[in-house]
């Protein structure tokens, strides 16, 4: 579903979905197992016992709280940018009650897991995970190739929900192969687009590090079960499509400012009011 929505505009399909990026959680299969919620993750952290076998593990959970994309799943479910097809610049709705609740729960991850926004960078966390020093981490699907090549035994699961009554839904970004209607040879252009998006789709991850948007492939990881990779398309299909109109980055920037503010101690109400005011100001300017 997400692939078709990303490749369409006003009901017309404009491109061939080639690959996608979205946040997921990875876990170290040698020392950990699947989780569905951050409450489960907290229980693991609170009751973690260091043994001779796991002595090299430095942290149970860490992630980069600074970027909009990796942090969208926690709160983004409670606002709709661009309408049902993510293309209407005048459309913006927000579920204030659940949005604020999600922001509050999100900010609590800082103290629950001792995460520093300045030092917990994506690269640092990736290095720790690939060295068996970190049990759980939020990554982009674009990071899976590096993890797979590291030799660590890992699993892939959806981003956990923050607490009962809240959902975590990732944002996805789809890369398309688009045929220019004014090209001198439409047939050749379509053949190339099909080759990239379909015929050679199984080679995309090994060559580029991106995950193919073709859903019927059996994904393969050297150090993860194929079922973990195949599950990616189920998550992707129901993901939030990044809005595709010019200027929408203004809203995403406001969102990133919001998560920085609450992470750094600003009250949820004040951060929300500033966010909402900024979005409304932008929407007023384009109406």
Placement of each model-derived feature along the sequence:
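Hinge/lid segment of periplasmic solute-binding proteins
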Residues: 1-24, 39-42, 53, 156-160
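Short glycine- and hydrophobic/aromatic-rich loop-to-beta-strand nucleating segment
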Residues: 23-27, 177-179
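Glycine-centered hinge/linker elements that transmit conformational signals in sensory
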Residues: 89-119
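Short helix-initiation/N-cap motifs at beta->coil->alpha
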Residues: 116-130
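Beta->alpha turn/N-cap motifs
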Residues: 122, 138-145, 175
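Paired acidic/hydrophobic, glycine-rich loop segments that form the ligand-binding mouth/hinge
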Residues: 135-140, 155
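Extracytoplasmic/periplasmic substrate-recognition and gating elements
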Residues: 148-209, 257
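Long, aromatic- and glycine/proline-rich binding clefts that accommodate carbohydrate-like moieties
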Residues: 157, 205-261
